[in-house]
Amino acid sequence: MRRGLFISIEGSDGSGKSTQLENIKKYYEDKGVKILATREPGGTEISEKLRSILLDKDNSEMSPIAEMMIYSASRAQLVDEVIRPALERGEVVICDRFIDSSIAYQGYGRGLGDMVEKVNLYAVGDIMPDLTIFLDLDPALGRKRVQERYGTESMDRLEQEKMDFHYRVYEGYKALAKAYPERIVSIDASRSIEEMKDDIYAQLDRLK
């Protein structure tokens, strides 16, 4: 059986990942293709428990290395339990965040550097996205959208980080897009939902 397609979607909070994930699901469902949508951190019972630890505002003392290791543990569990089996069944898998999030957030945002990529490549083994959609949005606009939609009180531990952290993350994403142009496609997320969707669908058409 032919291996399925693996698509990840990346970007800062407020960039519209959840909305575009639903659009990608619809793209494949309309074609009668079986699709599995999941998220990081999370996606399995164990990974969701790790997610609650990572995003809990009370865990402000978490060290950058501990944060990196918990993210990679969550990812390893998701790959082994959900993503790899689905790809082996020939399904399309779309994941809200994947390895690039760790490289951007912990590698660039926390300043841990190349160690993050090495640890996470070990966690995922041979499973990497065929296409990564990076929703490119200035972090200040992303934060404004999140605050307008949910309010400041609902922001999680990472969302509450200072803006200089989020700009380091953003620079990390841009560096990744430049380093891996054959896999990562940047989509201008300052535009309308429909304009973004049209550009994403054009990229999905290219995967055929």
Please provide the spans of the model-predicted regions.
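Pre-Walker A (Motif I) flank of P-loop NTPase domains
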Residues: R2-F6
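Hydrophobic anchor at the beta1->P-loop junction of P-loop NTPases
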Residues: I9
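Walker A (P-loop) phosphate-binding loop of P-loop NTPases
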Residues: G14
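Conserved lysine of the Walker
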Residues: K17
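Hydrophobic positions on the alpha1 helix immediately C-terminal to the Walker A/P-loop
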Residues: Q20
